[in-house]
Design a protein with these regions (language model features):
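Adenosine-cofactor binding site in Rossmann-like domains, unifying the SAM/SAH pocket
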Residues: 9-36, 44, 141-142, 146, ...
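S-adenosyl-L-methionine-dependent methyltransferase catalytic module, highlighting the catalytic core
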Residues: 55-58, 62, 68, 72-168
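Conserved class I S-adenosyl-L-methionine
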Residues: 1-8
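A short beta-strand submotif of the Rossmann-like class I SAM-dependent methyltransferase core
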Residues: 41-47, 56
Length: 169
């Protein structure tokens, strides 16, 4: 069983697609009804940043609960280190929005266009994953994985704006 956590409009067939937003018709709104140790893969694309900072560990512990031993989570988040570098280097093209100057684009990006509550560096996410019980925590590249199962990265988007992290239960 594979879970797309925070699926939005991207709802692949044969995955359990979960989103709390009522505009998306999904079978589940959270992980509560997913049995313990039942899932092989969880993909969470640009979702952890929408969770209040103090609730992130609770979400990661739920991932641990539903993953089978050896199951893997793949999390992608806005890469704030790259964003700061782009800002310092006056790279307006890093920020794909319609604002007319770098400062406005950077400001909009930092709040992930008003949807973000928690931006994490890759190291901060690594610590949170470790503290939640994950192991083999690895930063991976866009469309690359530490697994032989390519399904885990088929939902990747935003190659230049995001970083990708995988961890095993």
């Amino acid at each position: 069983m594979n879970i797309n956590f925070g699926c939005g409009s991207i709802q692949p067939f044969n995955w359990i697609n979960i989103d709390v937003d009522p505009q998306y018709k999904t079978e589940h709104k959270n992980l509560n009804l997913i049995p313990d140790n039942s899932c092989d893969i969880i993909v969470s694309h640009a979702t952890i940043c929408a969770i209040p900072h103090l609730e992130i560990k609770t979400t990661l512990l739920e991932f641990v609960r539903v993953l089978k031993p050896g199951g893997v989570v793949r999390i992608s988040l806005p890469d704030i280190v790259s964003a700061f570098d782009a800002y310092k280097n006056n790279n307006i093209n890093f920020f794909p929005n319609s604002e007319d100057n770098l400062d406005r684009r950077f400001s909009a990006w930092l709040t992930w266009y008003s949807t973000s509550r928690s931006l994490l560096t890759d190291k901060a996410l690594e610590y949170k994953l470790h503290d939640s019980g994950f192991k083999n925590i690895t930063k991976v590249k866009y469309k690359k994985t530490m697994l032989s199962n390519e399904k885990i990265y088929e939902l990747d988007t935003r190659e230049h704006e995001f970083y990708f992290m995988e961890a095993m239960k």
